Regions:
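Ferredoxin-reductase
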Residues: 1-80
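FNR/FR-type flavoprotein reductase catalytic core
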Residues: 71-152
Length: 152
């Protein structure tokens, strides 16, 4: 079982969870995703890794409750657990394999909105950790739906 350390509503109908998943946290890179399953009856749901902390062994996911399984997920609290939490899956962002010095010469701009901001955050964080400047343009239908603004 994969224990939920934190669960909160970031904005109207957008939720964030920090999940204990040490193996996933050790191996993930920006652009990858996990597949979660809350319980035996739940569907397997692919979700972008919004953040990871290798030292703490945690993964952060952000989602909107659209289907039955994500609607159940939004009711999970800190201390609850996911039945399955598989990852990291998918290809990392292209720049993870590029030469750092070459990346420093480029102008990198991300455009994101609403829950689609979640995949941008780990990429910006990775670039910043490697001394690479990048910009982000974040929008949403209303100011209340802008997420991760402080983090970025």
């Amino acid at each position: 079982m994969y224990k939920i350390q934190e669960a909160e509503m970031l904005a109207n109908n957008i939720y964030r969870m920090v999940v204990e998943a040490p193996r996933v946290a050790q191996h993930c890179l920006p652009g990858q995703f996990v597949i979660v399953k809350a319980d035996e009856e739940g569907e397997r749901i692919p979700l972008t890794i919004c953040d990871y902390d290798r030292e703490a062994g945690t993964i952060t996911i952000v989602f909107m409750p659209i289907g039955e399984s994500t609607k159940k997920m939004k009711d999970l609290k800190a201390g609850d657990a996911f039945m399955d939490f598989v990852g990291p899956l998918g290809q990392p962002s292209e720049f993870c394999s590029e030469d750092i010095e070459e990346l420093k010469k480029k102008r990198i701009v991300f455009v994101a909105g609403g829950v689609g901001t979640a995949p941008v955050y780990p990429q910006l964080k990775w670039l910043h950790e490697h001394g690479i400047t990048a910009d982000a343009i974040v929008g949403a239908k209303t100011k209340d739906l802008v997420i991760l603004e402080k983090e970025m």
